[in-house]
Amino acid sequence: TVKDATGAVTAVTAEDFNQGIINSPEQLIQGKTAGVQISQSSGEPGAGIDIRIRGANSVRSNNNPLFVVDGIPLSGGNTTAEGQNIGVGTNSAKNPLSFINPNDIESISILKDASATAIYGSRGANGVVFITTKSGKGGRGGSWDFSSNLSIATVAKTFDLLNAEDYLEQSDFFGFNVAERNFGNSTDWQDYIFRTSASTNNNIAYSNNYGTGNVRATFSYGKNFGVVENTSLERITGRLNANQRLLNDKLKLGLQATISRVNDEVAPTGASAGFRGDLLGSAYSANPTWPTSPNFDGTGGLLSPATALAYTQNTSFTDRYLVNFSAEYNFISELSAKVNVGYDNSTSSRTALATKKARNFDQGAFGNGLGAINDLDTESKLLEVTLNYNKEFSNSSLDVLAGYSFQDFTRSGRNVSGFGFFADEFNEMGRDLEYVASEVESRIQGDYQQYGYAPNISDGIFVNRLFPEPATDFIPNLNSGLVRSLFVDTFDNTDELQSYFGRVNYSIADKYLFTATMRADGSTRFGKNNEYGYFPSGAFAWKIHNEDFVGDSVSTLKLRLGVGITGNQEGLGYGNYTQRERYAGGDVISDGGDINIPGTVILSFPNPDLKWEETLQYAAGIDFGFNNDRLNGSLDVYRKETTDLLFNVLSAQPATQPFQFQNLPGSKVVNEGIELAIGYDIIDTEDFNWNTNFNIAYNKNLVEELDGEFNAGTIRGQGLSLAFAQKLKAGQPLFSYFLREFEGFDPVTGQPIQNDIQEFVGKSALPELTGGLSTSWSYKDLTLSAYFAGQFGHYIYNNTANAFFTAGAFRGGRNVPLDVLQTGESFDAAADVSTRFLEKGDFVRLQNVTLSYNWPMPEDAFFSSLMLSVTGQNLFVITDYTGLDPEVSSSPGGDDLLNGLPVFGIDYAAYPRPRTFTLGLNAKF
């Protein structure tokens, strides 16, 4: 339990979860725990979420923690296929946890320090989030739970752009040809792509506890429509939890099974969109006198939002199955053994299409049509065996755990690209592309990596094979006439993780608690000389409140000390310690439909010494409570040192190999911080209760040692090719901004006054302070609760303004806010990457307010309980940031990351965060 823990562990139960529209489990606990930063990358339904527990450790991985669902460690990778570029950039993958129905969750525990996470060894460096689902409850005959809600969402904020009249007036004022700019309409393009959306979520559950066992079965259906046209997320889930005791309770059997289907619809948006922008960027910059006809061709090469909406479609489905079976046998009262078998499987396919009417799209879409199918299959199998010895002595207790686990992770799939479609209707285009790819595949004999055809390839369909030696051969062409050019790239990777672990807990007089943990992990991701890593930890806790010298008013007072080593293997990829060769992929089809048959490339070179990143953490904390914990809290301090950073390093030339995955020698990232959490039951009477909880955390991040410098943070926009805003270097925090210092505009020339070179500006995208405040008032059966969240000390690079809101953009015919034209900027000034677009990201948000009424029920009523609730989310935000929302970070696809480094703190036309109101009904019978 948390009270007996020697490490930093926080548990949040269902009654304290956030309410409203919840697409994934992380949102349930956002802001509830000190030192845990949870940020949704955008307001899009199912968008990815970044979680940082006690700072960011790694320079390559996403720094998210390990998620464990009912004892099954999840793979950590994406389970929804990323989208390919069909002319507006690539789509990032969605949240892999969206398959879990939040209503099925009983509690979420967060393991923060090394003494708590070391039992997970090489996967615990970023912390561990343990999700426990609900089990069967209720008496004879069982009970039913039903919940349903309806939500209405609107865009919380829009840009204050020029309307048609003002646009023409400003054009005339600055001497532009108004006749060429006036197309006779008055269009609010933000209003055109945004909408008021309605969403629903419905759950029904049967629960029964029949003495020797229990069962809980649930079914849920939810449909969340986004506030941007053509965006939605549909989730259908079923879950079964069953437990049975046999042989006089010596044998315990458990089964947890989830099946889900998530259907996703995405608008033509992409964090890697070109200078024209995507749907959002085009709506922010489109001429307000353009008509809303999707066939309008007077844009001067710019993208019309009407065209983007009408002639693109991007949909996906993800089927996922998560099953865990356990058997535990008690040989004697002190000794038990447990076997845990887990299986996690997902099948995902995304189809993105742009018809031949998609004017001003990249990659030759207009007049031809583009299509892409991305298939991703993941599978993970787990076998875990543990032996537990628990012995109570006269004045002490001993708990010993020893175990073995084996888990494999397989990822396979294909990426299909099509160019030049005969059809011009979405469903028909998708069917034709799937048919052509499958028909060609059925004709290929033997193993292959790639295949395709194009008009410029006269020998037929090329097939690239890797085994037994890389070779290209040809088979007869398909000649279907349905798709002019086709390219298919396949992949199939498997990783294995084998582990031995042990833990000893020893307690003396329920006052002095000792914990020692050791785990040895062996992974196929690393070199032969370092297949195994060893991760020890130790911790001590002193329950001071059990000492005789402590007064009765002190209900909890516990000192905790811990030290340990954990590891990280994420962000590395597959087989990168060996020399691995494959055929090049990417955008192989040219804008004209030709294909240059790809040749082989070396993806990695031998490095038998490649090993885990290691994080050494020291932590100390104190838990306190007074008057039966009416006032309670905790104070923690920590230092985390991550070394042996994994990186793809270019070799000094001349060299036999141009690059190699290495553990950077002497590399070290340090996080130091302090966390405070306080809860207080201010009023606690029979009829009226008022409680509040507050948490705040400070974290300082620094790259103390690093050999070399690495550019990061790609910036998008016209004239910004190869531009970047961040750099990784020793002496700076992660995600540090590297910019020109901007001091204004020359009053004579209107040119920017700024440095000629980029340099560190002493600012980072990582917040130094995070905090949350929740409070709840209840009077009899009426309850009102509110939750505030805040982040401070960080900066956001406003790439949206850099790309679209400049005087030069207005000269090019784009719309802008009025204040852009009042800065004195010359219309021919270059919009360089500079501190002009760097803004403070501090904010305080009223994230959640819920008013609920628990209807009193007579004993003979059909319903045992009935509750009605109204919830408002994202009601207001206090910030100086001029973008749509300060809690944002663009997430381009993995292939678009500069130097393979993750992006954080850069806002490029991110999907706006909605303001939502939800009416809910919960009934038990």
Feature names for model-found ranges:
Residues 1-240, 245-246, 251-260, 322, ...:
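Short, small/polar-rich motifs associated with maturation and membrane association
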Residues 5, 63-64, 69, 75, ...:
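Surface-exposed loop/interface segments of Gram-negative outer-membrane beta-barrel transport/assembly proteins
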Residues 105, 238-240, 339, 498-504, ...:
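Extended, hydrophobic alpha-helical segments in both membrane/secreted and soluble proteins
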Residues 133, 163, 204-208, 240-244, ...:
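Residues on the lipid-exposed face of transmembrane beta-strands in outer-membrane beta-barrel proteins
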Residues 148, 219-223, 514-526, 563, ...:
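Transmembrane beta-strand segments that form the barrel wall of outer-membrane beta-barrel proteins
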Residues 233-245, 531-541, 866-877:
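Short secondary-structure subsegments characteristic of cysteine-rich extracellular domains
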Residues 765-797:
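Glycine-rich, aromatic-lined ligand/substrate-binding cores of catalytic
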Residues 849-878, 892-893:
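C-terminal structured "cap/appendage" subdomains that terminate the fold
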